[in-house]
Amino acid sequence: DLMFTHYARTFDGLAQAQTQMDRCELAGYLEPRESYVSILELGLYEATGKIHASLEERGLKRFSPEWNSAFDELLQEQAQHPRNAGRLWARIPQRRYVCFYPMDKKREGADNWYMLPFEERARLMLDHGKIGRSFHGLVTQVISGSIGFDDYEWGVDLYADDPIVFKKLIYEMRFDQASARYASFGPFVSGVQFSVDELSTFLAGEAVPAMRVIEAVQV
């Protein structure tokens, strides 16, 4: 199997990449099996809670036009913060191994994520995030939202220099309440990541294609 991953700033950019892929000679030898479209996003429960408190202090009625406008403005400030902007407009992590899986939050009887109060969801995600942070430096995680774009609600990409890290991280998260009670997972895909110019090596089947780290270009 061969998985292509492409980041673009617009949907038109994704469409252009798809068109170019369809037109190349290699496409005639490939049989498409799956595709996934999503947008990079950040978990901002803590920041959102602070924004809610700020708007309430200003006397704004929850979810009124004034509230929504002020909320969007403050959230945009968060998106433009250097720490967050670098993650929202990231490039594909250049690590040797990759694992991808889609997931949903459950909406089943008492296990309905979307019926929980915001504060409870924030608490659960804080605990969930602590597990991920315990693997800091060992894995690069990219979360993307796909509600309205694909069959699942989120896509999770994990990149590491040791594939065993994927197993350890995902196993630990299985015991976290946000996952154990409220998460539903799709199929997992994992493999070796390699540079585009190593495609001929992969197709020849004579050696494992290499992953060459390319320095980021400052724009």
Walk through the language-model features, giving the residues of each.
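Active-site loop/lid in soluble adenylation, ligation, and acyl-transfer enzymes
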Residues: 5-14, 22-28
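C-terminal structured interaction module
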Residues: 161-209
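Short S/T/G/P-rich N-terminal loop/turn motif that feeds into the first structured element of a domain
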Residues: 9-13, 41-130, 200-219
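Catalytic micro-motifs at enzyme active sites that drive phosphoryl/nucleotidyl and oxygen chemistry
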Residues: 21-24, 87-89, 142-145
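Short, well-ordered beta-strand segments in beta-rich or mixed alpha/beta enzyme
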Residues: 1-10, 98-103, 148-173
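A cross-family "folded-core" feature that marks the main globular domain of proteins
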Residues: 15-19, 31-34
